[in-house]
Design a protein with these regions (language model features):
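Charge-dense, helix-prone N-terminal extensions
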Residues: 1-109
Length: 109
């Protein structure tokens, strides 16, 4: 999923929580994180949060649930296209919160 995240406009990778967690960011703000055990957490809309968590397709992300992040313990349970779409949406949600100047600098304006 790292390739999918980094293919999104302006996306970067860093390791603020140690080498075992890949954090994907847009404009310095995180939109997805992959853990060493193969799980992934990402930002979703309020509606997607309710649908995904209530249906059992995802669980509230530890430490990030109040900000409407979900966690998938096993990404191989999801179709690649479905997960890629959710990651693109997560990227878009976070990018939309950037200032107009920051979006323009990233080529997103």
């Amino acid at each position: 999923m790292g390739k999918v995240c980094l293919a999104l406009p302006g996306a970067t990778l860093d390791h603020p929580f140690g080498d075992h967690h890949d954090a994907y960011r847009i404009g310095g703000k995180m939109f997805a994180m992959v853990g060493e055990m193969g799980g992934i957490s990402f930002k979703v809309s309020d509606i997607a949060y309710e649908v995904l968590t209530e249906s059992g397709r995802a669980r509230p992300a530890p430490y990030l649930a109040r900000a409407k992040w979900v966690n998938l313990e096993r990404i191989d349970d999801w179709p690649d296209d479905d997960l890629a779409e959710h990651l693109a949406i997560a990227h878009g949600i976070i990018a939309a919160k950037l200032t107009k100047k920051a979006r323009a600098a990233l080529g997103l304006a």
